[in-house]
Protein backbone atom coordinates (compact mmCIF):
# COMPACT_ATOMS: atom_id res chain seq x y z
CA UNK A 1 0.00 0.00 0.00
CA UNK A 2 1.45 3.37 -0.95
CA UNK A 3 1.78 6.29 1.45
CA UNK A 4 -0.72 8.29 -0.61
CA UNK A 5 -3.27 5.51 -0.39
CA UNK A 6 -2.80 5.15 3.34
CA UNK A 7 -3.08 8.93 3.77
CA UNK A 8 -6.41 8.94 1.91
CA UNK A 9 -7.73 6.17 4.14
CA UNK A 10 -6.79 8.06 7.27
CA UNK A 11 -8.76 11.06 6.06
CA UNK A 12 -11.94 9.02 6.48
CA UNK A 13 -13.48 9.85 9.88
CA UNK A 14 -12.68 7.01 12.22
CA UNK A 15 -15.78 7.52 14.36
CA UNK A 16 -18.65 9.91 14.49
CA UNK A 17 -21.75 9.93 16.61
CA UNK A 18 -23.80 6.83 15.83
CA UNK A 19 -27.33 7.55 14.68
CA UNK A 20 -29.96 4.88 15.27
CA UNK A 21 -32.62 3.87 12.77
CA UNK A 22 -36.29 4.36 13.59
CA UNK A 23 -38.18 1.13 12.75
CA UNK A 24 -41.63 2.68 13.24
CA UNK A 25 -41.90 6.40 12.49
CA UNK A 26 -45.60 7.07 13.04
CA UNK A 27 -47.54 10.07 11.73
CA UNK A 28 -51.21 10.85 11.17
CA UNK A 29 -50.62 10.05 7.49
CA UNK A 30 -49.06 6.62 7.94
CA UNK A 31 -46.04 4.69 9.16
CA UNK A 32 -42.53 4.35 7.75
CA UNK A 33 -39.14 3.03 8.79
CA UNK A 34 -36.33 5.58 8.74
CA UNK A 35 -32.83 4.29 8.06
CA UNK A 36 -30.58 6.97 9.51
CA UNK A 37 -27.27 5.27 10.28
CA UNK A 38 -25.67 6.66 7.10
CA UNK A 39 -26.54 10.29 7.90
CA UNK A 40 -23.30 11.00 9.83
CA UNK A 41 -21.16 9.39 7.11
CA UNK A 42 -22.89 10.02 3.79
CA UNK A 43 -25.56 12.55 4.76
CA UNK A 44 -28.10 10.11 3.31
CA UNK A 45 -31.35 8.79 4.78
CA UNK A 46 -33.63 6.03 3.54
CA UNK A 47 -37.38 5.70 4.00
CA UNK A 48 -39.29 2.41 3.82
CA UNK A 49 -43.01 3.09 3.56
CA UNK A 50 -44.90 0.60 5.77
CA UNK A 51 -48.48 1.84 5.78
CA UNK A 52 -50.15 4.97 4.45
CA UNK A 53 -53.60 6.49 4.62
CA UNK A 54 -55.35 6.60 1.22
CA UNK A 55 -54.08 9.53 -0.83
CA UNK A 56 -51.66 10.63 1.90
CA UNK A 57 -48.30 9.37 0.59
CA UNK A 58 -47.01 12.85 -0.19
CA UNK A 59 -47.88 14.04 3.31
CA UNK A 60 -46.25 11.00 4.93
CA UNK A 61 -43.09 11.49 2.92
CA UNK A 62 -43.10 15.19 3.78
CA UNK A 63 -43.07 14.37 7.51
CA UNK A 64 -40.29 11.82 6.99
CA UNK A 65 -38.19 14.19 4.89
CA UNK A 66 -38.53 16.96 7.46
CA UNK A 67 -37.29 14.68 10.21
CA UNK A 68 -34.42 13.33 8.10
CA UNK A 69 -33.30 16.85 7.20
CA UNK A 70 -33.50 17.88 10.84
CA UNK A 71 -30.98 15.19 11.80
CA UNK A 72 -28.59 16.15 8.99
CA UNK A 73 -29.63 14.29 5.84
CA UNK A 74 -28.87 16.10 2.59
CA UNK A 75 -30.28 13.36 0.34
CA UNK A 76 -33.32 11.19 1.02
CA UNK A 77 -34.45 8.04 -0.79
CA UNK A 78 -37.65 6.03 -0.44
CA UNK A 79 -39.09 2.63 -1.30
CA UNK A 80 -42.18 0.58 -0.52
CA UNK A 81 -45.07 2.18 -2.44
CA UNK A 82 -46.22 2.02 -6.07
CA UNK A 83 -46.77 5.79 -6.27
CA UNK A 84 -43.05 6.33 -5.76
CA UNK A 85 -42.64 5.41 -9.43
CA UNK A 86 -43.67 9.01 -10.13
CA UNK A 87 -40.46 10.12 -8.41
CA UNK A 88 -36.94 10.05 -9.83
CA UNK A 89 -35.60 6.49 -9.91
CA UNK A 90 -32.24 6.34 -8.15
CA UNK A 91 -31.15 2.71 -8.16
CA UNK A 92 -31.80 -0.84 -7.05
CA UNK A 93 -30.25 -3.53 -4.91
CA UNK A 94 -29.85 -6.66 -7.03
CA UNK A 95 -29.40 -10.23 -5.85
CA UNK A 96 -27.00 -12.46 -7.79
CA UNK A 97 -26.37 -16.20 -7.41
CA UNK A 98 -24.32 -18.94 -8.94
CA UNK A 99 -21.90 -21.82 -8.49
CA UNK A 100 -18.40 -20.83 -9.52
CA UNK A 101 -14.96 -22.29 -8.99
CA UNK A 102 -11.89 -20.33 -8.03
CA UNK A 103 -9.16 -20.01 -10.64
CA UNK A 104 -6.11 -21.32 -8.82
CA UNK A 105 -3.78 -19.09 -10.82
CA UNK A 106 -5.53 -16.04 -9.34
CA UNK A 107 -5.70 -17.21 -5.73
CA UNK A 108 -3.51 -15.18 -3.38
CA UNK A 109 -2.90 -15.19 0.39
CA UNK A 110 -5.71 -14.89 2.94
CA UNK A 111 -5.22 -13.39 6.39
CA UNK A 112 -8.18 -13.64 8.79
CA UNK A 113 -9.21 -10.46 10.57
CA UNK A 114 -8.36 -10.49 14.28
CA UNK A 115 -9.13 -8.32 17.29
CA UNK A 116 -5.93 -6.42 16.57
CA UNK A 117 -6.72 -5.80 12.89
CA UNK A 118 -10.52 -5.50 12.72
CA UNK A 119 -10.51 -1.72 13.15
CA UNK A 120 -8.06 -1.25 10.28
CA UNK A 121 -9.98 -3.72 8.11
CA UNK A 122 -13.18 -1.80 8.74
CA UNK A 123 -11.58 1.54 7.88
CA UNK A 124 -10.16 0.15 4.63
CA UNK A 125 -13.55 -1.23 3.61
CA UNK A 126 -15.30 2.02 4.44
CA UNK A 127 -12.76 4.01 2.45
CA UNK A 128 -12.99 1.82 -0.65
CA UNK A 129 -16.80 1.60 -0.58
CA UNK A 130 -17.70 5.14 0.47
CA UNK A 131 -18.76 6.06 -3.10
CA UNK A 132 -20.64 2.80 -3.75
CA UNK A 133 -24.41 3.19 -3.60
CA UNK A 134 -26.16 1.39 -0.73
CA UNK A 135 -22.90 0.16 0.85
CA UNK A 136 -23.41 0.28 4.60
CA UNK A 137 -20.74 2.00 6.67
CA UNK A 138 -19.13 -0.34 9.20
CA UNK A 139 -18.82 1.14 12.68
CA UNK A 140 -16.99 0.11 15.84
CA UNK A 141 -20.25 -1.43 17.03
CA UNK A 142 -20.04 -3.90 14.12
CA UNK A 143 -16.61 -5.23 15.06
CA UNK A 144 -17.84 -8.01 17.35
CA UNK A 145 -20.18 -9.24 14.60
CA UNK A 146 -17.36 -9.14 12.04
CA UNK A 147 -15.08 -11.16 14.30
CA UNK A 148 -17.70 -13.69 15.37
CA UNK A 149 -18.59 -14.41 11.74
CA UNK A 150 -15.10 -15.78 11.15
CA UNK A 151 -15.35 -14.82 7.49
CA UNK A 152 -13.56 -11.48 7.21
CA UNK A 153 -10.18 -11.43 5.48
CA UNK A 154 -7.34 -9.35 4.11
CA UNK A 155 -6.02 -10.53 0.75
CA UNK A 156 -2.29 -10.08 0.09
CA UNK A 157 0.04 -10.85 -2.79
CA UNK A 158 3.75 -11.03 -2.11
CA UNK A 159 3.34 -8.91 0.99
CA UNK A 160 1.21 -6.23 -0.68
CA UNK A 161 -2.40 -5.64 0.29
CA UNK A 162 -4.75 -6.29 -2.63
CA UNK A 163 -8.08 -5.91 -0.89
CA UNK A 164 -10.52 -7.24 1.67
CA UNK A 165 -13.59 -9.43 1.76
CA UNK A 166 -16.25 -10.94 3.97
CA UNK A 167 -17.97 -14.29 3.46
CA UNK A 168 -20.61 -15.86 5.69
CA UNK A 169 -22.91 -18.85 5.16
CA UNK A 170 -22.55 -18.88 1.39
CA UNK A 171 -23.03 -15.13 1.05
CA UNK A 172 -20.46 -12.62 -0.12
CA UNK A 173 -21.18 -9.72 2.22
CA UNK A 174 -18.34 -7.46 1.11
CA UNK A 175 -15.56 -7.26 -1.44
CA UNK A 176 -13.22 -4.36 -2.08
CA UNK A 177 -9.95 -3.92 -3.92
CA UNK A 178 -7.23 -1.61 -2.67
CA UNK A 179 -5.09 -1.80 -5.79
CA UNK A 180 -6.60 -0.86 -9.17
CA UNK A 181 -7.62 -3.96 -11.12
CA UNK A 182 -7.19 -6.29 -8.15
CA UNK A 183 -10.89 -7.06 -7.75
CA UNK A 184 -10.77 -10.30 -9.74
CA UNK A 185 -7.86 -11.68 -7.72
CA UNK A 186 -9.58 -10.71 -4.49
CA UNK A 187 -12.75 -12.44 -5.68
CA UNK A 188 -11.00 -15.67 -6.72
CA UNK A 189 -9.08 -15.76 -3.45
CA UNK A 190 -12.34 -15.56 -1.51
CA UNK A 191 -13.91 -18.17 -3.81
CA UNK A 192 -11.15 -20.58 -2.82
CA UNK A 193 -12.92 -20.82 0.54
CA UNK A 194 -16.27 -21.90 -0.93
CA UNK A 195 -15.09 -25.03 -2.79
CA UNK A 196 -17.57 -24.38 -5.59
CA UNK A 197 -20.61 -24.19 -3.29
CA UNK A 198 -23.49 -21.88 -4.32
CA UNK A 199 -22.68 -18.23 -3.72
CA UNK A 200 -25.10 -15.36 -3.18
CA UNK A 201 -24.48 -11.62 -3.03
CA UNK A 202 -26.21 -8.26 -3.27
CA UNK A 203 -24.94 -5.44 -5.46
CA UNK A 204 -26.06 -1.92 -6.36
CA UNK A 205 -27.43 -1.59 -9.90
CA UNK A 206 -25.10 1.38 -10.40
CA UNK A 207 -22.01 -0.68 -9.54
CA UNK A 208 -21.53 -1.77 -13.14
CA UNK A 209 -17.89 -2.75 -12.78
CA UNK A 210 -18.72 -5.21 -10.01
CA UNK A 211 -21.72 -6.59 -11.91
CA UNK A 212 -19.60 -7.19 -15.01
CA UNK A 213 -17.04 -9.06 -12.91
CA UNK A 214 -19.68 -11.22 -11.24
CA UNK A 215 -21.39 -12.03 -14.53
CA UNK A 216 -18.08 -12.89 -16.16
CA UNK A 217 -17.44 -15.34 -13.34
CA UNK A 218 -20.83 -16.98 -13.86
CA UNK A 219 -23.19 -15.34 -11.38
CA UNK A 220 -26.63 -14.41 -12.67
CA UNK A 221 -29.10 -11.76 -11.58
CA UNK A 222 -31.93 -13.49 -9.74
CA UNK A 223 -33.95 -10.74 -8.09
CA UNK A 224 -34.40 -6.99 -7.75
CA UNK A 225 -34.53 -6.80 -3.97
CA UNK A 226 -35.28 -3.12 -3.47
CA UNK A 227 -35.94 -0.22 -5.83
CA UNK A 228 -35.09 3.23 -4.46
CA UNK A 229 -36.38 6.64 -5.55
CA UNK A 230 -34.80 10.00 -4.77
CA UNK A 231 -37.36 12.21 -3.07
CA UNK A 232 -35.07 14.94 -1.70
Task: Say what each PLM segment does.
Residues 128-171:
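A mid-sequence, solvent-exposed acidic-amphipathic segment
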Residues 75-78, 84-85, 146-148, 165-167, ...:
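Alpha-helix C-terminal capping segments
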Residues 76-78, 172, 199-203:
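Conserved hydrophobic beta-strand within the GNAT/NAT acetyltransferase core sheet
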Residues 11-63, 157-179:
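Conserved donor-binding loop and adjoining core beta-sheet/short helix segment
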Residues 2-19, 103-136:
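Short amphipathic alpha-helix that is part of the acyltransferase structural core
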Residues 3, 7-11, 49-109, 225-230:
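Acyl-donor-binding surface of acyltransferase catalytic domains
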Residues 54-66, 179-194, 211-216:
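Conserved acetyl-CoA-binding loop-helix of GNAT-fold acetyltransferases
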Residues 193, 200-232:
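Hydrophilic extracytoplasmic domains
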Amino acid sequence: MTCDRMENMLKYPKEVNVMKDIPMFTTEFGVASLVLKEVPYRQEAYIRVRDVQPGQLRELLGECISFCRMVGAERVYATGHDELENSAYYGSVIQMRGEIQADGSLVENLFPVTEQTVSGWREICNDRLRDVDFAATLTAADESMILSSGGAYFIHRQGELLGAGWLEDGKLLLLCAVLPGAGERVMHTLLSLTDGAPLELEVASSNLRAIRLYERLGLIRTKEITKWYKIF
